[in-house]
Regions:
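Active-site pocket-lining/capping segments in soluble small-molecule metabolic enzymes
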Residues: 23, 119-145, 197-225
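Hydrophobic faces of well-ordered beta-strands that scaffold small-molecule active sites
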Residues: 10-18, 43-45, 72-76, 101-103, ...
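Catalytic domains of carbohydrate-active enzymes, especially glycoside hydrolases
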Residues: 31-46, 165
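Glycine-rich, positively charged N-terminal anion/phosphate-binding segment
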Residues: 25-33, 51-70
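Glycine-rich, proline-tolerant flexible connector loops at the mouths of alpha/beta enzymes
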Residues: 39-60, 108-120, 171-185
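Glycine-rich anion/phosphate-binding loops
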Residues: 78-95, 119-123
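Active-site mouth loops of central-metabolism enzymes
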Residues: 11-27, 72-84, 141-157
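N-terminal amphipathic alpha-helix/helix-capping segment at the start of soluble metabolic enzymes
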Residues: 1-14, 21-22, 131
Length: 225
């Protein structure tokens, strides 16, 4: 489990995305074989919008865990998930030896109305965490925003929601990307004051294209110096 890595002064990880085309999964395997040589502590695998790539997420996570022999962190989103599909995915991950999950709300599909969203069985990460804990001894990570979740009124409200997730059983937090270290240090101070004392891993992203940066900044709520 990732928990065994938490004692290290520096925890290094990478993230991969399931391919849209089935044929491209072998290219992901090749990339993972290269990433393995960097000796990451874990590799996370994202989850498609609305659960569109859930099977690929489980398959790639299993490759990371069993072939690359690196801890795999499978993303899991509330949006697009129901009780049956959650249990099926957890069973599949457990069967494949994947013990680490990143519990997220996920992005609402553009075609989903607010009314449809409100009718979902799971809407937020806070809905997922108790169900994950009931269905296996998983290490559960959560996401956090050093510069406030774009949908939160303010950072105080944001940290209250974060504390709720931690109290439900999160084992660690991974931040969205940020560029301002001072914002991160300030955020960490506020977490301590709120009684949040689980490990927090800083999320960074190499900038390879201006368009990519713009999209990522919008999703993460981070400021650009």
């Amino acid at each position: 489990m990732i928990q065994e890595k938490e004692h290290k002064s520096v925890v290094f990880s990478c993230e991969v995305f399931p391919p849209k085309r089935d044929d491209d999964i072998y290219q992901i395997y090749k990339t993972l074989d290269e990433i393995k040589t960097l000796k990451p502590d874990f590799i996370s695998v994202t989850y498609g919008a609305g659960g569109s790539n859930s099977k690929k997420t489980a398959t790639i996570a299993a490759y990371i865990q069993n072939i690359c022999e690196v801890e795999a962190l499978a993303h899991m989103t509330a949006v697009g998930m129901d009780e049956a599909s959650l249990r099926a995915l957890l069973f599949e991950l457990k069967k494949k030896g994947v013990e680490n999950i990143l519990a997220l709300r996920g992005d609402k599909p553009r075609t989903m109305s607010q009314e449809e969203f409100d009718q979902r069985y799971f809407k937020y990460a806070t809905d997922l965490i108790p169900e994950i804990k009931k269905n296996g001894d998983f290490f559960i990570a959560g996401a956090c925003y050093p510069e406030v979740h774009p949908e939160s009124k303010n950072q105080e409200e944001d940290i209250q929601h974060l504390k709720q997730k931690v109290d439900l059983g999160l084992n660690c937090l991974i931040t969205q990307m940020f560029f301002d270290n001072n914002a991160f240090y300030s955020f960490m101070d506020k977490l301590e004051k709120a009684g949040i004392d689980i490990p927090v891993h800083a999320g960074i992203m190499p900038v390879t294209a201006a368009k990519q940066l713009g999209t990522s900044v919008t999703l993460s709520g981070s400021s650009v110096p």
